[in-house]
Amino acid sequence: MHNHLALRHRNSTSLGSRFLGILAGILILASSGQASADEWRIATLAPDGSAWMKILNKGATDVAAKTSNRVTFKYYTGGVQGDEKDVIRKMKMGGMDGGAFTSVGLSQIEPSIRVLELPMIFASVEEMDYVRHKMWGTFMKRFAKKGYILLAPGDVGPIHFYSNAPIKTQADLRKAKVWLWGEDALVKAMFKKIGVNGVPMGVPNVLPALNTGRINACYGSPLATVALQWYTKIRYMTSMTSSYGVSSTVIKKEIWDKMSPEDLSLVKKSLSSHAKKLRSAVRKDNKRAHKAMLRAGVKEIETPAETVETFRKTGEAVWTELVGELYSQKDLDRVLKYRAEYRAK
């Protein structure tokens, strides 16, 4: 595996530079580089100078031109404003105007959105798409009531476990020192049900922790794992997909509402045109990242059918446990209803 470091770097450079979608599907445009009295300050964990940011900058230039620079964005990239919870806090205090988030960050504003990421609830990304489309309008209204504009949905990708020892059973997972993203209530509940003592920390701390051995296992999409260089410190990944990561960009409503009707129409049209392209790009890059890891020496361990079934039963128990804590019974019922609709097609 270590003989493939050159390949790792080459692959992680091209793929990692395009991982913006892991954080939010980021449908807002990046900074146009031109100052404006109404310039929006948007924070993201995505790296500056990446190929993905270059694409978004082209779009930002287009928006700036169409609005005569009345609408511009300034991105604070690479986590310089902190982890997602830090950005949320700064938004509430007026330090930031918006952020590009995974569902972990989004749930700091509206916890119920995590109902879309329940463990083992979807059998495919297409199934998730169908349910998400049916429910996204509800989440947009909930965010608006709390003073935020939730934009179009983005993808993080299929979530797998990555480790330095093969994980074929829940017992194997219990033996590992597994990362837990801060106090993520959903993953924490799943880990508790399995009997895993997660090691809580923010995303920027994961790679150093893998380096020192503080943790020896983590979870995420292939694209995130390559982009963040985690895969250079692990040897195995599970074939099982436990969930499909959801993301989006959020803007403070008071900032959004300052736009004129004309500019609002232009911005909405631009965001809409980029939404599908970004989701498509993230899905393609997740597949490329998966292949790149395998070429670099990471071994994919086929998850036994009995283990998948065990995780499914554990997941179903967690769905019920989190009712009233993250989302309502009605929210869960709607997810299951729309899932059944899709499966009946």
Show where each model-derived region lies.
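N-terminal secretory signal peptides that target proteins for export/translocation
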Residues: 1-16
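Low-complexity, intrinsically disordered segments with a bias for serine/threonine
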Residues: 16-21, 35
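Bacterial N-terminal signal peptides
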Residues: 20-31
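Short linear Ser/Thr-Pro motifs
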Residues: 31-32, 67
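N-terminal secretory/targeting leader peptides
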Residues: 37-127, 135, 139, 143-345
